[in-house]
């Protein structure tokens, strides 16, 4: 079983969350969105624990992967935090709107050898 934290609960995040929930190989342990009411509501739909600080997911040793579906401006920040804690990463596109930030992020991922 692969334990996952989903960050971002907009339309695409909810869609990915429902898909993850249907797959028995995954456990959607945490959901997070900047909107606390939405986090609480969607956590019930996705049968997962709501968190109101994404660092909880990064620091949890049981979390194997971080699924990033938040706004584009948060992607690099969340990716680098996942890299720091050696989590596997899935990030919705685009990674960022700045190619230099993307290149720097890519270098850090290669250095840390995460997925």
What is each PLM-predicted segment?
Residues 1-45:
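N-terminal Rossmann-like dinucleotide-binding module
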Residues 16, 48-108:
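Beta-loop-alpha module in the N-terminal Rossmann-like domain of NAD(P)-dependent dehydrogenases
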Residues 26, 87, 114-115:
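Short, well-ordered coil/turn segments that N-cap beta-strands
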Residues 107-115:
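Basic phosphate/pyrophosphate-binding loop/patch that engages nucleotide-derived ligands
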